[in-house]
Design a protein with these regions (language model features):
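Conserved Rossmann-fold NAD(P)-dependent oxidoreductase catalytic core, especially the SDR/UDP-sugar
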Residues: 78-127, 137, 143
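Alpha-helical substrate-binding/gating segment
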Residues: 164-174, 181-216
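Conserved beta-loop-beta element that borders a ligand/cofactor-binding pocket
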Residues: 132-154
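Substrate-binding strand-loop-helix patch
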Residues: 154, 182-189, 208-228, 270, ...
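Mid/C-terminal beta-alpha module of Rossmann-like enzyme folds, strongest
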Residues: 197-248, 253-254, 287, 293-304
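Conserved C-terminal active-site "lid" loop/helix of NAD(P)H-dependent oxidoreductases
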Residues: 188, 242-268, 274, 281, ...
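NAD(P)H-binding glycine-rich loop region in Rossmannoid oxidoreductase-like domains
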Residues: 35-84, 94, 100-101
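N-terminal Rossmann NAD(P)H-binding glycine-rich loop of SDR-like oxidoreductase domains
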Residues: 4-24
């Protein structure tokens, strides 16, 4: 049985990854501060990523899946081992982001495109770039995954959860402009499947965009969320002069990733309807796990008044 280390492990992406691979033929360890419930069937290594200390001395892992945010996260992890080679002796997989691509590049963004600061994502994107570059300088055979908007069960980010809440409360939905904003999504279990293929096979490409091949409009996304929640949808369009991040979970920014390389590893992705239906089933039982924003209060005070 191979040993796997997942950094984090207590919220959305890292938690889903840890539980997914714990059900497979892996002995899964998670590295976190132990301030939240741990993923099922995993073993905890309790440490703060900024101060790992001796928690990883004497340890070695065949596979590492790293959800770190910045160069220091990767550096702290690699230097916490007796040798960096022991940190993912077979595969080191870093979950990066589509935020590494400047908004000025031609779209769809290809993996070969030059990374740089994106004015929408700011430091989040540049921190991911620096983490990628440092990792490749230390472990050149590492794999880097660049997803768009991830969704699915365990998503604690107030995206589909916001729309589900509106649907459950039979609220009119306030849609930015005409709802034509294009969004690219990727289902969390599809991310797991791509990583599983990377682990099992000798994948030649080491930087891989992931995502659904087709984007969906904000309007269709909201319609689908209301449909899986079993609620009729009434929409009011909101003037573009009102900052949409005050009342909507996405920026007024369209982008698309080229996922040609991903299709070699995962020819078929989860349909949005089925994926959101699974998200809703999780949401109904775990509403307290979602990090809510004040969208509804803002709408009621500033828009619907």
């Amino acid at each position: 049985m191979k040993k796997m280390l997942v950094t984090g492990g207590t919220v959305f992406v890292s938690k889903y990854l840890a539980e997914y691979f714990a059900k497979k033929d892996f002995e899964v360890f998670v590295l976190n501060r132990n301030t939240r419930p741990q993923p099922e069937n995993t073993r905890l290594i309790q440490a703060d990523r900024d101060n790992i200390g001796t928690a990883l001395r004497g340890q070695s892992f065949d596979i590492v899946i790293d959800t770190g945010y910045a160069e220091k996260d990767v550096r702290n992890l690699l230097t916490a081992f007796d040798s960096p080679e022991l940190c993912g002796s077979q595969k080191y997989i870093f979950i990066s982001s589509s935020a590494v691509y400047p908004e000025t590049l031609p779209q769809p963004f290809k993996e070969s495109a030059k990374t740089g600061r994106n004015k929408i994502w700011g430091d989040y994107g540049t921190n991911k770039i620096q983490a990628e570059e440092y990792l490749l300088s230390q472990k050149k055979d590492s794999y880097i995954i660049r997803p768009p908007y991830l969704y699915g069960p365990m998503n604690n980010v107030y995206r589909e959860a916001f729309v589900f809440e509106c649907a459950q409360k039979a609220r009119t939905f306030y849609m930015p402009k005409d709802g034509s904003l294009k969004l690219q999504f990727f289902y969390i279990e599809d991310l797991c499947k791509v990583i599983e293929t990377i682990i099992e096979k000798n994948v030649q490409n080491h930087i891989i965009n992931v995502g659904n091949e087709e984007c969906t409009s904000a309007l269709d996304w909201v319609k689908t969320c209301y449909e899986v929640a079993g609620s009729p949808l009434s929409i009011k369009n909101v003037d573009g002069n009102i900052g949409q991040r005050n009342y909507f979970p996405f920026y007024d920014y369209e982008y698309k990733l080229d996922v040609t390389l991903q299709k070699e590893l995962l020819p078929k992705t989860q349909g949005l309807m089925e994926g959101l239906a699974k998200s809703y089933e999780w949401y109904k039982k775990n509403q307290d796990a979602v990090s809510k924003k004040n969208f509804i209060a803002y709408i009621d005070k500033e828009i619907a008044k």
